[in-house]
């Protein structure tokens, strides 16, 4: 948490919202508030990677996937990546409880700057937004959805991944 303590003095939040870190992603990282939109969650997760706050990455992943994550590997990745910027390209409300955020994250590669572009899916469960991680095992289309809606995966989040 020392990275967070240091970041609280940052004038500009790493998510590039143009807000002070303490008034932006900092309040989410310290669990003083929860993101109200999928975009806020996306920005706070990016900032968590910048600050190497892996516990936040885990708890903001949909609960049914949290035990499938490998925090040690996430930490290694964060330690070996220098993030340079975030650009939100598009935010879509898919349903009342599902949204997509397309973004581009700029990072320093071995020899030059590189960009990672992705369309991420977020789901709202009990008034909190979570990231649906497509890199871990997902249920088959006929199994219950990862979001806990009670619907089959193919009729819920599976249709967006």
Swiss-Prot record:
Gene3D superfamilies: 3.10.450.50
One Pfam short name: SEC-C
This protein's name: UPF0225 protein HI_0277
PANTHER family recorded: ADENYLATE CYCLASE-ASSOCIATED CAP C-TERMINAL DOMAIN-CONTAINING PROTEIN (PTHR33747:SF1), UPF0225 PROTEIN SCO1677 (PTHR33747)
InterPro entries from the UniProt entry: NTF2-like_dom_sf, SEC_C_motif, UPF0225, YchJ-like_M
Sequence similarity: Belongs to the UPF0225 family.
Membrane-spanning residues: none
Source taxonomy: Bacteria, Pseudomonadati, Pseudomonadota, Gammaproteobacteria, Pasteurellales
Origin species: Haemophilus influenzae (strain ATCC 51907 / DSM 11121 / KW20 / Rd)
């Amino acid at each position: 948490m020392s990275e967070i303590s240091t970041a609280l003095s940052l004038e500009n939040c790493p998510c590039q919202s143009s807000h002070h870190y303490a008034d932006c992603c900092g309040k989410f990282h310290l669990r003083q508030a929860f993101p109200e939109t999928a975009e806020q969650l996306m920005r706070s997760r990016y900032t968590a990677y910048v600050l190497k706050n892996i516990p936040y990455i885990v708890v903001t992943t949909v609960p049914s996937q949290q035990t499938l994550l490998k925090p040690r590997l996430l930490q290694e990745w964060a330690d070996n990546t220098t993030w340079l910027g975030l650009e939100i390209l598009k935010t879509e409300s898919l349903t009342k409880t599902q949204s997509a955020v397309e973004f581009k994250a700029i990072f320093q590669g071995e020899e030059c700057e590189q960009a990672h572009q992705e369309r991420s899916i977020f789901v709202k469960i009990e008034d909190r937004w979570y990231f649906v991680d497509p890199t871990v095992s997902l249920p088959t289309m006929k199994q219950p959805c990862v979001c806990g809606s009670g619907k089959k995966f193919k009729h819920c989040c599976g249709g967006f991944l």
